[in-house]
Regions:
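Alpha-helical cap/lid subdomain in secreted, periplasmic
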Residues: 108-257, 261-264, 272-281
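Functional beta-strand-loop-alpha-helix junction segments that form "active/interaction loops"
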Residues: 91-103
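Residue-level preference for short coil/turn positions at secondary-structure junctions
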Residues: 37-38, 89, 117, 160, ...
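Flexible, glycine-rich phosphate/dinucleotide-binding loops
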Residues: 51, 102, 173
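Alpha-helical scaffolding within the catalytic cores
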Residues: 75-78, 105-113
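Secretory targeting and sorting signals
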Residues: 1-25
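Serine-esterase "nucleophile elbow" of acetyl-processing enzymes
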Residues: 23-93
Length: 281
């Protein structure tokens, strides 16, 4: 075999080793240390939080400031962090999160992620399932889990090599604790923000306290189901270990229009606590 043929085959072999077959960029290995795979596309699934609602000074979705796929420098999103390591993801960050979305809406978003062939998928859902008009209207825990499983199954079936990050629901009860004696927050909440939790926000009566605790308990139950669903998914799913729920946020991290959704600083905080460091699971 001629020498240039040998060299050509060697180059092809190196190129093959540098790609894992999914299109993910892989840095060169150092010794026996495994290479880190950086996705070249991603999708965000969820509700108004991930849609960046209220993060751009008005009460509309503002995807550019999403903790997941945002492009704005004010929020060091997952997309921006990945882009620093893999420029191929530029323009390939898809945000399918919708204000008002519940777990029942997640499967349609998952199908969109499949159509986009997303190599990295973030999931933050459940706040609206708890923020019903009445406590009895909250999504039952078993139903919630069934809907989460259906969406994750859609991703796994069509994108078995993609990485999935499932994020915990924020501690909405803490939000009430922080704002129930804040005049501006109370005025905003009285417009109908998360009524199961925030209705009659200044009351410290037994019935209202019991209602709020029911909502808090339901969110805890949802988070347990999210963790279990991710565990059942397998090694390609990463749970945030409750990091978002455990954030000790202040009212400075929510917008001062509805006193509910994260502002740009809040979105940046979400990006920080959910960032896995590298996407190699």
């Amino acid at each position: 075999m001629r020498r240039w043929h040998v060299i050509g085959l060697a180059v092809l072999a190196v190129l093959a080793l540098a790609c894992d077959g999914t299109g993910m960029a892989r840095p060169a290995q150092s010794g026996t240390r495994s290479a880190v795979s950086w996705p070249s596309s991603m999708a965000a699934l969820g509700d108004s939080i991930t849609a960046g609602f209220g993060s751009c000074f008005t009460l509309v979705a503002c995807e550019r400031r999403s903790w997941s796929t945002g492009s704005d420098s004010a929020v060091d999103s997952h997309y921006r962090r990945i882009r620093e390591a893999n420029a191929k993801i530029r323009g390939q960050a898809h945000n399918y999160a919708k204000p008002g979305a519940r777990a029942a809406d997640l499967n349609s978003q998952a199908r969109a992620a499949v159509a986009a062939k997303a190599q990295y998928v973030t999931v933050l859902i459940g706040a609206n399932d708890a923020c019903a008009r009445r406590v009895q209207d909250m999504t039952p825990v078993r139903t919630f889990r069934t809907q989460i499983d259906a969406a994750l199954r859609t991703v796994k079936k069509s994108l078995p090599r993609s990485r999935v990050l499932v994020v915990s629901i924020p501690d909405l009860y803490r939000l009430w604790q922080l704002g129930h004696d804040d005049e501006q927050a109370v005025r905003a909440w009285n417009a109908g923000i998360c009524p199961a939790l925030l209705a009659n926000p200044t009351s410290t009566g037994i019935a209202d306290g019991r209602r709020r605790r029911q909502v808090a308990n339901r969110i805890d139950a949802y988070n347990r189901q999210l963790a279990d669903a991710c565990r059942a998914y397998g090694t390609r799913c990463r749970w945030d270990n409750g990091e978002v729920h455990n954030v000790r946020f202040s009212l400075d991290l929510v917008n001062h229009l509805d006193y509910f959704h994260p502002n740009s600083e809040g979105q940046a905080r979400l990006a920080e606590v959910t960032w896995p460091g590298r996407i190699s699971w």
